[in-house]
UniProtKB/Swiss-Prot annotation:
One of its GO terms (molecular function) is sulfotransferase activity. PANTHER family: SIALATE:O-SULFOTRANSFERASE 1, WSCD FAMILY MEMBER CG9164. Residues 36-572 are extracellular. Residues 1-14 are cytoplasmic. Belongs to the WSCD family. The gene is Wscd1. This is Sialate:O-sulfotransferase 1. It catalyses: a ganglioside GM1b + 3'-phosphoadenylyl sulfate = an 8-O-sulfo-ganglioside GM1b + adenosine 3',5'-bisphosphate + H(+). It holds the Pfam family Sulfotransfer_1. Glycans are attached at N105, N254. Sialate:O-sulfotransferase which catalyzes 8-O-sulfation at the Sia-glycan level using 3'-phosphoadenosine 5'-phosphosulfate (PAPS) as a donor, forming 8-O-sulfated Sia (Sia8S)-glycans. Displays selectivity toward glycolipids such as GM1 gangliosides. Signal peptide: none annotated. Residues 139-231, 242-337 form the WSC domain. It is found in: Golgi apparatus membrane.
Length: 572
């Protein structure tokens, strides 16, 4: 009996030594693999390959410029805790295939919408072309440090922000694209363009903030501008914008009084006239024979009475009439309505700018900000919009420092927080397409064909169509004081509708400022280029569903003493 016991004891001792040895070998092997992986990952992170593979969690948390490849070039980014970018980039990742949105659970749907908003695949802003490498300071001279404290900005032709990736060349490219001569950088993340230098030069030491995206380069300070000349554009940069033909118009009675600047030259061309007016920062170049005039839109020359282009023709066989002129839009922005600020005192009336997603809320904010001169706020935070100049995005939505607050929320509690609201309504067919494009391709992109053909599109329509209806119905029911604005009316009759909106906001606006807004009505928020998907995306079943919601909303508007929906909404 004792002999088998001793054999068992001997076997167990050997097993203990064997397990201890295997455990030590396993730990050593794992440590070696981790060290090897760390050595390989570091040079890969520094090389920043063109095809993105992963994003730091910190980048995802910020929600600004998520899919911009340049954010991976920062060697200080944490290499651990990485997320798969393909997962972030894919619209299907936002809602897994097979999962249908609950029709009745509106709060759940809105939470999903807000989550997708911060992971917008939109690239860098329109005014910030991709920088292909580090800043090249030889392309433009550094002109010094300037102060614009206590005075109106001189460099205000174009403005954009980038809290994480601003560089000198980034700003220079943006200004060059719009034919400006000078690029000024402020507070490490702000870029201003113009053709005149600020008047007050200060010590170079006062421009002491590094560029957010370029260590070692100075990008001004608070109310201090590091100013560079733009110089020649680099290969791969966006081409300079050219003059855009606006039409043929009658010459005003008093040309000298109406047009601020002029030049006469033999064989005058559009390029020469546009360049002359751009240098003087005028948005309009007017051409008549050998005469070139520069001007702003005014009540005397409002660009609303265009005539047949043959009356302005320069061809010998047509011989245009002397009382008409050709008008071109220069690349320069009309600066009479670009200055914006926060409200000097907290607003006593808390106003919402409410709409269904895809109904043109961002465009309406652009119009309101430039018409009133005050920033608009947002219930959400969208870094892409902040980079395009919506400074109110960073302000807390309940600060009451903005003229109104963007929201897509509905439901009694959310609505009754506001004292009044502008309710922006758009044709649901167009709203659904616009929001689907934004979800799949960003604010200015188009959803690829594969998204339209997938299950995602019918699931999107089934859930979001009912939200379009419930959003309007809730605001009509619980809103304390409303102004109903239809997107189509705002586009077709911009100045009268916008005048009604600013009056509702209790702001006095001059006619010239409204004309300035009309002259730059699109801003940077319209999708450019040809739509890649021109086929009818709505099936008969989808149309039956949407048409039912249209009838419901149309009747609700009439029941609340508002005009019904525009005729183009109502199914025939």
């Amino acid at each position: 009996m004792a002999k088998p016991f001793f054999r068992l004891q001997k076997f167990l001792r050997r097993t203990q030594f064997l397990l201890l040895f295997l455990t030590a070998a396993y730990l050593m092997t794992g440590s070696l693999l981790l060290l090897q992986r760390a050595r390989v990952a570091l040079p890969q992170a520094l090389r920043a390959p063109g095809s993105l593979q992963a994003l730091p969690v910190a980048t995802v948390a910020l929600g600004v410029g998520l899919l911009d490849g340049r954010s991976l070039r920062d060697p200080h980014s944490s290499p651990d805790l990485l997320l798969d970018v393909d997962t972030l980039r894919s619209p299907l990742a936002r809602l897994p295939p097979g999962i249908r949105w609950p029709r009745r659970n509106r709060s759940s749907l809105r939470r999903r919408w807000l989550h997708h908003l911060t992971s917008d695949p939109q690239g860098p802003p329109t005014l910030s072309p991709e920088a292909s490498g580090p800043a090249n300071h030889n392309r433009g001279n550094y002109l010094g440090c300037f102060s614009e404290e206590g005075q109106e900005r001189t460099l205000k032709g174009a403005v954009f922000y980038d809290l994480r990736k601003m560089t000198v060349s980034h700003c220079q490219d943006a200004c060059a694209e719009r034919s400006y001569v000078y690029a000024g950088l402020e507070a490490g993340a702000e870029c201003y363009c113009g053709n005149r230098l600020p008047a007050t030069r200060v010590s170079l030491k006062e421009c002491n903030q590094e560029c957010k995206g370029e260590k070692g380069s100075m990008c001004g300070a608070v109310r201090r501008l590091s100013v560079y000349s733009v110089g020649l554009q680099q290969p791969g940069s966006k081409k300079r914008r050219t003059a855009t033909y606006r039409g043929c118009f009658p010459l005003p009675e008093n040309v000298t009084h109406t047009f601020s600047s002029s030049m006469t030259q033999a064989n005058m061309t559009v390029e020469t006239c546009s360049g002359f007016c751009s240098q003087k920062e005028f948005p309009l170049a007017i051409l008549r024979g050998w005469d070139c005039y520069c001007a702003y839109p005014t009540p005397q020359f409002s660009l609303r009475d265009a005539v047949d282009g043959a009356l302005c023709s320069q061809a010998p066989e047509t011989q245009g009439l002397p009382g008409y002129c050709e008008v071109y839009q220069t690349p320069v922005q009309d600066t009479r309505c670009t200055d914006r600020k926060f409200l000097p005192d907290k607003s006593k009336v808390f106003v919402a700018l409410s709409s269904f997603p895809g109904a043109g809320n961002t465009w309406a904010r652009h119009l309101i900000e430039h018409a009133t001169g005050f920033y608009t706020g947002s219930y959400y935070f969208d870094g892409t919009l902040y980079n395009k100049g919506f400074k109110g995005e960073k302000d807390h939505w309940r600060s009451r420092r903005t003229i109104c607050v963007k929201t897509h929320e509905s439901g009694r509690r959310e609505i009754e927080m506001f004292d009044s609201a502008i309710l922006l309504i758009r044709n649901p067919y167009r709203s659904l397409v616009a929001e689907f494009n934004r979800k799949c391709a960003g604010h200015l992109g188009y959803a690829p064909d594969r998204n339209w053909k997938s299950k995602e599109w019918p699931e999107f329509v089934n859930s979001y169509a009912s939200w379009w209806s419930s959003h309007v119905l809730d605001w009509l029911k619980y809103g304390k004081r409303l102004l109903v604005v239809h997107y189509e009316e705002l586009r077709h009759s911009l100045v009268p509708t916008l005048r009604e909106m600013v009056a509702f906001l209790n702001v006095s606006v001059s006619e010239e400022r409204l004309l300035c807004v009309e002259n730059n009505k699109e801003g940077s928020f319209r999708r450019r280029g040809r739509r890649p998907h021109d086929q009818e995306p709505f099936t008969p079943e989808m149309k039956d569903l949407i048409n039912g919601y249209i009838r419901t909303v149309d009747q609700a508007l009439r029941d609340h003493n508002w005009a019904g929906l525009p005729r183009e909404y109502v199914p025939r």
